[in-house]
Amino acid sequence: MARITIPYAVADFADMRERGFYYVDKTNYIPGLEDYKAPVFLRPRRFGKSLLISMLAHYYDRTKANRFEELFGGTWIGEHPTKEHNQYLVIRYDFSAMVMANDMEGLAQNFNKLNCIPVEVTLEHNRDLFGDFQFTTRGNAAQMLEELLGYASSRGLPKVYILIDEYDNFTNQLLTSYNDPLYEKVTTSDSFLRTFFKVIKKGIGEGTIRTCFCTGVLPVTMDDLTSGYNIAEILTLEPSFLNMLGFTYEETKTYLRYVLDKYTPGASEERFEESWQLIVSNYDGYRFSPVGERLFNSTILTYFLKKFAANAGSIPPELIDENLRTDINWIRRLTLSLTNAKEMLDALVIDDELSYNVSDLSSKFNKKKFFEKEFYPVSLFYLGMTTLKSAYRMVLPNMTMRSIYMDYYNQLNKIEGNASRYVPVYELYDSNRSFEPLVQNYFEQYLGQFPAQVFDKINENFIRCSFYELVSRYLSHCYTFAIEQNNSFGRSDFEMTGIPGTDYYTDDRVVEFKYYRSKDADRMLALTEPLAEHVEQVKGYAEDTKKKFPNYNVRSYVVYICANKGWKCWEV
């Protein structure tokens, strides 16, 4: 089998190029970045920010000039280099490596211990310019940076290019751990962090620093630093940079074809379409402007593609990168109270959307605003837990995030997930492939745990999301799933498709869910067959699937959930 060249968790640009890993070329954004002195680019966790930082470091570092063709040959910038390539003294900081502490003294000590090293590394890499220069002060990151800048300026040395990865990582950790008083100290007065950024601000003003490029997740810390770094230019929502991180549809399709061609030679076009549909259902949906392209989270997608390649083109059993589940800590912290958390989750898993003010998508906002209830949608947007549907509404970005939210919803509402409730039915499904018992089990064992008043609040969106979350727990090793799958006949409620290489391959189930509240329950439960329009609807979806994949055995169902009074399931 060919060597796996899908770079999951590879954030070193030189390592990626040396080892022949697949690289989605983002070097065309370099010329645009050169128009800024203090750019800040924010994206949710695991969106490829560290690789971008590494790429820029290798592009601008004067000590890497002899490797330019090796590292950038075949890329856009390799064919269109700017005059500034390999011209600077590069200092690269990574705040995500910061060790936390419970007081200012400990944080300052850890900050300095971490951030003195990059300045020393730059000095040693450029010893040909610095001769016998030695720092007169050690152990203070701001003072050492200032001393190096002063020496470089006095000797007419090249300018400094500073890169700061995850600038807000440790301050965000203070927020998620409810240590607001310490956060306030770090971002105000003459704290070690403000002093550090003041040195950078001064260096940019004097011309000794060419650029300081920061990545992060939230604009909160940058805003709370106020005058300490009021020169920051946040590019997050700028149209020309929207696709700088994350993969577009075109980039993702090219990536998928590369994987299929290399690891499953001779794969049919149908195989490509099957894989593409799975990817869109599970990973698609991020949009950072109401008019922007939809983007894939690059790290999550690469996680899938690496497993896909390692399995020689078979769908991996685990589609969710478990590292994402830690984002739930932000929901707990953001909402502050159980009531607020439940209200927000109700809006997302029941109504499937949150309304927002487009003017709130500003480049900067402070901690106080971040935790205001009316601002939750925007806060979640920056965290990557919602995305833009339109200029008025936000939604969950994809099936991966739906699963995470649904799991948290069940936790908050104390819905038991013990396997004994569900396993017997799914074991039986392995042998008889009967869909109806899955609906019965869902109604009795899952919905049966909710109090009566909940059934006046939930709707079809909740039914399909919660049904998906339950079924995917036990059948994800043999089926892939889609909710509101786009096709020419409309958007199907729920579809489960057998995974290639398993005994379930070509088995496809299309389901139309209808939910009725108590007042209509008895009338609907008395029906002996589903309403004609519902049959027509689901058959249209099934025909669409059959046209796309003629070898599939497509079966269609209409399911009525009638409050907490009963259910109906017909195969049509």
What do these predicted ranges mean?
Residues 1-46, 51-60, 69-77:
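Walker A/P-loop-proximal flanking segment of P-loop NTPase domains
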Residues 14, 61-124:
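P-loop NTPase motor core
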Residues 147-155, 182-210, 541-544:
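Substrate-engagement module of ASCE P-loop NTPases
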Residues 156-186:
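Conserved P-loop NTPase "ATPase switch" module shared by AAA+ and STAND
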Residues 163-165, 194-195, 209-217:
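Structural recognition of the conserved hydrophobic beta-strand(s) that form the central parallel beta-sheet
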Residues 221-227, 235-306:
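Amphipathic alpha-helical segments of the small helical/lid subdomains adjacent to P-loop NTPase cores
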Residues 232, 294-534, 542, 572:
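Extended alpha-helical interface modules used as scaffolds for assembling large macromolecular complexes
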Residues 526-571:
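Nucleic-acid nuclease catalytic cores
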